[in-house]
A protein has these predicted regions:
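Short, gly/Ser/Thr-rich active-site loops of penicillin-recognizing serine hydrolases
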Residues: 245, 266, 280, 285-293, ...
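Short, conserved catalytic-motif segment at the N-terminal edge
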Residues: 1-39, 60-63, 116
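Active-site Gly/Thr loop motif
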Residues: 184-254, 282, 286-340
């Protein structure tokens, strides 16, 4: 439908493309300043904000979350560390009572639920992707320590100083340049896999054994609550766009994200402004947890502190490539940095494709790019 693609190499923009349409009826063309919901790419942005607080000594990743957020420390959550929230091993990957979808702008309703609920598994026992809860968990930590929301913090500390076109929580004035997202349900692919639960392990490869185990635990449908998909247009509503959902509703341009990851891949500094120190970037892009991920179909995802280091079937972590860190989004958007190439890469789109084709375009673009610059 529509997309933008940008690459920053050694602090220079070498690719900046956009085209297609912003809506299903093809009445609005995708323009240079069109922004789009990048979904879970937002997690990387949220992690960057927390990284700034970590390197300033305001947060210690090895301390318990309850040290900063006392109300959180109950029902088995007493020992969960900040690090475990960041690397998806905290056991808080879903809402036990289901996710409220009637008022996305009510931050406190999500916080109260997370404070009161019990863990799904012992902290550190499994890697289980915190698909939506990640944003409220990390966002509340930031708010407790700094006083600002994630959207406010990123705007003040990163976006405005570096002229990066990316926001978590839009204003109504942004709606005119915002592309609609055409979503498909994730449930058909999940339903196609369910028969694996009844296939004897003898007939399964290791990767399908992991998928079978993940399906049996049913963490997948817990984390990706089916009620969200009852109205697949919810991501285009004013309520969703105005809310701050730091795991899933960041909006921006490919140019902005390529610039951001380009800076982080080149030491974290542009001119006199330092986003993160090199040692912080290095720590955040180290592998801190390794799959099989019990939410992401048992696949061997590798996570740093909020960053994906290896994401199967996407450009991030493909074989014979550099040291990558970034994130993907459920509608097909991808942004990452490569420290070996001092490069930032971003492909953003507004039409979700099915299953194995979800990241097909970004993989092909990344492969073509590396064939040129290698």
């Amino acid at each position: 439908m529509g997309a933008s693609f940008s690459v920053e190499l050694e602090n220079q923009t070498i690719i900046d493309l956009w085209g297609g349409f912003c809506d299903a009826d093809k009445t609005r063309k995708w323009e240079r300043d069109t922004i789009v919901n990048v979904f879970s790419v937002s997690k990387a942005i949220t992690a960057i904000c927390l990284g700034r607080l970590i390197e300033r000594g305001l947060i210690n990743i090895n301390l318990a979350v309850r040290d900063y957020w006392p109300e959180f420390g109950c029902n088995g959550k007493e020992t969960i560390t900040v690090k475990q929230l960041l690397d998806h091993t905290a056991g808080m990957f879903a809402f036990r009572e289901g996710i409220p979808i009637d008022n996305w702008q009510d931050w406190n309703q999500y916080i109260r639920l997370l404070e009161s609920q019990a863990i799904y598994h012992e902290p550190g026992q499994h890697q289980a992707y915190h698909a939506l809860t990640f944003g409220w968990l990390i966002g509340e930590l930031i708010k407790r320590v700094d006083g600002r929301t994630v959207g406010e913090y990123f705007r003040d500390e990163v976006a405005q100083p570096l002229d990066i076109d990316f926001k978590i929580g839009l204003q109504s004035k942004d709606f005119g340049r915002c592309a609609d997202t055409i979503m498909l349900s994730t449930l058909p692919s999940l339903n196609q896999l369910r028969p694996l639960k009844f296939v004897p392990d003898l007939f399964l490869s290791p990767i399908f054994k992991n998928i079978k185990k993940a399906l049996k635990q049913d963490y997948i449908s817990e984390a990706f609550d089916p009620s969200i998909l009852e109205d697949q247009n919810f991501v285009n509503t004013d309520d969703w766009r105005l809310a701050e959902i730091p795991a899933a509703n960041g909006h921006g341009t490919a140019r902005g994200l390529a610039k951001l990851f380009g800076i982080l891949s080149s030491g974290g500094r542009e001119a006199e402004y330092q986003i993160l120190e090199q040692h912080t970037i290095d720590t955040m892009r180290e592998i801190h947890s390794f799959g099989p991920d019990m939410v992401l179909f048992g696949l061997p995802y590798k996570f740093g502190l909020g960053f994906m280091i290896n994401a199967p079937m996407t450009p991030i972590g493909r074989k014979k490539r550099g040291n990558m860190f970034g994130h993907t989004g459920i509608a097909g958007s991808v942004a990452f940095g490569d420290v070996d190439k001092k490069m930032g890469f971003s492909f953003l789109c507004n039409k979700q494709h099915k299953d194995l084709k979800l990241y097909k375009t970004s993989v092909e673009l990344a492969d073509a790019l590396y064939n040129i610059i290698d």
